[in-house]
Regions:
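Intrinsically disordered, low-complexity linker/terminal regions across diverse proteins
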Residues: 2-231
Length: 231
């Protein structure tokens, strides 16, 4: 939390919420513009977009590390005690309702994620620093940087894997059979494109294995660009 107090101010969190709001609108408009998708599936996609939850910077409730002993003289000892501390905490959580508000990453972590079973996106304070995010920068900078990351994570809710989960995080096919076939035909174009990339002599990318990330990159950039044009 001390890191977040210094590195991620409340006004920065408000700005991130604004960016996410705008990208959600852009994503909905992109879905509306899909000529191959039926009105039935679009309705379900709208419901999923509206149900997205977000975790920005740091959790609202911090569990802390009371009871964990840190010794400056023993790095190995600190690692051992930290692992034991976390293991005991996990044991105490057994049998309790799952807390969906917890973040799967610490505030200083430089990363972002989408959780299909919660239908939520997470952006720790660590990634909300330059060059990804700069509160004092103009829209062009932030939509180009963190905007693409936001778009990428939102898109994971509709890629080859995330699209199999509904707005409530249930593993449920909410697409019509025809729409799913249309999606898979288009996704196969991305698979074939990346199958053709030779990273080393005779070694090619597995486009099917990287499909979700590639869809996220393509669509994330597009969604962020259209959101920027309206900013």
């Amino acid at each position: 939390m001390e890191y977040a107090k210094i590195a991620f101010k409340p006004e920065a969190k408000a700005r991130m919420n604004e960016l996410i709001d705008n990208l959600m609108v852009s994503m909905k408009e992109r879905v509306d513009g899909l000529k191959w998708m039926s009105a039935e599936t679009k309705k379900q996609a709208h419901a999923k977009i509206a149900s997205f939850k977000r975790k920005i910077g740091y959790p609202d409730v911090l569990r802390g590390y009371v009871g964990l002993t840190i010794d400056r003289k023993s790095y190995a000892g600190n690692i051992l005690r930290a692992n034991q501390f976390q293991l005991q905490r996990n044991f105490k959580d057994l049998g309790k309702p799952r807390d969906k508000t917890r973040m799967g990453m610490t505030p200083p972590t430089v990363n972002a994620s989408y959780n299909s079973t919660n239908n939520d996106i997470t952006f720790p304070a660590g990634i909300l620093q330059p060059p990804f995010f700069n509160f004092n920068a103009d829209d062009a900078i932030n939509y180009c940087a963190i905007g693409c990351v936001i778009g990428h994570e939102i898109t994971h809710g509709f890629d080859d894997s995330g699209s199999r989960f509904d707005a409530d995080g249930n593993l449920k096919m909410w697409w019509t059979d025809s729409d799913r076939k249309q999606f898979e035909e288009r996704a196969d174009c991305v698979v074939k494109q990346f199958n053709g990339y030779e990273v080393q002599p005779g070694l090619f990318i597995n486009g099917k294995l990287t499909l979700g990330e590639n869809i996220g990159d393509f669509a994330g950039l597009t969604v962020s660009y259209y959101a920027f044009k309206k900013s």
